[in-house]
Amino acid sequence: QENTMKQLPRIYCDMDGVLCDFKKHAEKETGVSIAKWSNLSKSEKWGPIKENRYFWSTMPWMAGGKQLWNFISMYKPHILSAYVEESFDPNCIPGKTKWLKTNVQVPTDRINLVRRVQKQNFANKNSILIDDYNKNISDFKKRGGIGIYHTSTSNTIRELKKLGF
């Protein structure tokens, strides 16, 4: 088992839209559909979220999120998630960190909270990104990494199994 693990690529797993349901939580917090929320001004969009200092730490699991985490957890995955700029929402980084400590018990040295554009910097031939945002996947692949565009847990697990997991 240990030998096999060394040869498998490192898994980087996104949070929002993969493990936790940001959209559902944002709809609950703002009272508008995610489609409508997307078209609001920056302050209308983020105001109610910023006002709730527990927003990030109390996001619900994504449907299939626990199942996916249970599958990948034995491979010592890293979290690679984007944060909202600290000046804009100072609760984001500590809130996401708390969510991870509470829900997945991932060690701090495997938590990478970065600007969205920095995700591609983690790419190499021995790394996989699981992400629900296609641009992150294409940027990661351009840098030589393996990308799994997350549309469902069953599909992502199928893709991981094809890679030898």
Model regions and ranges:
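A general structural motif
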Residues: 6-8, 74-76, 108, 124-126
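Donor nucleotide-activated moiety binding/catalytic core segment of transferases
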Residues: 97, 104-129, 133-137
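Acidic, Mg2+-coordinating phosphoryl-transfer loop and its flanking beta/alpha structural elements
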Residues: 124-162
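Short hydrophobic segments within beta-strands
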Residues: 14, 80-82, 130
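Active-site neighborhood of HAD-like aspartate-dependent phosphohydrolases
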Residues: 5-53, 142, 152
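Substrate-recognition element of Asp-dependent hydrolases with the DxDx(T/V) motif
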Residues: 56-61, 65-96, 100
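Short catalytic/ligand-binding loop motif for oxyanion handling, primarily in non-cytosolic enzymes
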Residues: 20-23, 28, 77-79, 86-90, ...
